[in-house]
Amino acid sequence: MDLQDTIRTYRLFSGSYDIVFGPVFHPGRKAAVGIANDRPGQRILEVGVGTGLSLPYFRRDSQVTGIDVSAEMLEKARSRTARLGLAHVAGLHEMDAENLDFADNSFDAVLALYVASVVPNPARFAAEMRRVC
């Protein structure tokens, strides 16, 4: 799938994503965030934050930044963050996972839940995650 296909796909799914995929991926999402929550005060990047389903599960003493290529999915994540008062969410940005606009070693942990299968170049994606963490 190329980047434009991914953007189009998630634009289409943004309205129904939580209903269709939320319950299916919930156990894995919660388990992964639980692992990321192992230390207090971490700077965490969530690549492919989507509608922000995982954001409520991060420790409140962490600083979570989320990125996604879908503006429509990010709008839902921003609404969720505001509605739930998730002050630990430091920012939500429209960004390509293969070209992260962050300095080297900007984060203590990086999560990418269900993302590797939809990026055009998984090796580049993995290299970017290593670079920023």
Predicted regions and their residues:
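Conserved class I S-adenosyl-L-methionine
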Residues: 1-39, 53, 76, 83
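Class I SAM-dependent methyltransferase SAM/SAH-binding core
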Residues: 43-99
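GHKL-family ATP-binding catalytic core of two-component histidine kinases
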Residues: 70, 101-103, 120
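A short acidic, Gly/Pro-enriched loop at the edge of an enzyme's catalytic core
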Residues: 95-109
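A short SAM/SAH-binding and catalytic strip from SAM-dependent methyltransferases
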Residues: 109-121
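A short glycine-rich, Lys/Arg-flanked "PGG" loop and its adjoining helix->strand segment in the class I
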Residues: 123-133
